[in-house]
């Protein structure tokens, strides 16, 4: 609990005073191949910080500005996942037509600690998550988004079923 409190206070300091709070809900363990599923509801909170960790690529192309995030995911079958990682975002209009639009593309990658609770057994406490998200920015700068993510232990153990998540989120700037 002390570690969680330290991390929470650290990431809420003025150094990290811009970005988005992301509140999401979705479908956990979505299967597209008809195989057995241990579906649950996925609840997610992330804090996406607006400060760039380091820049790679051309200066005029913000697609390469890597930014940190931290969050927690909980499922209706009591699994929990504490995660930290990097994300980037790019305006889809600017990416394809050169003109800004309200559509934002946000891929992310993170690593975290997973406790399966009564949920799906993913084979290891350490798990990796990759997510692709498209959001629509409203006039007040809030965003609504849909995302697809995959959690896996990257073959750190012999058991590695992985899990797919489809979720919807509401994002509020801070």
PLM regions and their residue ranges:
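Helix-adjacent hinge/juxtasegments
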Residues: 77-107
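Residue-level signature of outer-membrane beta-barrel architecture
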Residues: 47-51, 88-94, 136, 150, ...
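Membrane-embedded beta-strands of outer-membrane beta-barrel proteins
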Residues: 43-47, 84-86, 132, 168
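Solvent-exposed loop/turn segments connecting transmembrane beta-strands
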Residues: 30-40, 72-83, 97, 119-125, ...
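Transmembrane beta-strand segments that form the barrel wall of outer-membrane beta-barrel proteins
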Residues: 21-31, 63-75, 107-113, 146-152
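Cleavable N-terminal export/targeting peptides
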Residues: 1-19
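Outer-membrane beta-barrel "beta-signal"
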Residues: 41-45, 161-174
């Amino acid at each position: 609990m002390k570690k969680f409190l330290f991390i929470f206070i650290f990431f809420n300091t003025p150094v990290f005073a811009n970005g988005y709070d992301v509140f999401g809900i979705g479908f956990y363990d979505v299967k597209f191949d008809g195989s057995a599923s241990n579906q649950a509801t996925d609840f997610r909170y992330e804090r996406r910080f607006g400060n760039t960790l380091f820049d790679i690529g051309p200066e005029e192309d913000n697609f390469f500005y890597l930014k940190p995030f931290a969050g927690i995911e909980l499922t209706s079958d009591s699994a929990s996942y504490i995660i930290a990682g990097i994300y980037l975002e790019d305006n889809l209009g600017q990416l394809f037509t050169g003109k800004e639009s309200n559509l934002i593309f946000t891929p992310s990658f993170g690593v975290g600690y997973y406790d399966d609770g009564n949920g799906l057994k993913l084979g290891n406490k350490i798990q990796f998550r990759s997510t692709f998200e498209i959001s629509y920015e409203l006039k007040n700068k809030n965003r609504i988004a849909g995302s697809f993510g995959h959690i896996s232990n990257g073959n750190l153990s012999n058991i590695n079923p992985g899990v797919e998540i489809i979720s919807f989120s509401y994002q509020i700037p801070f």
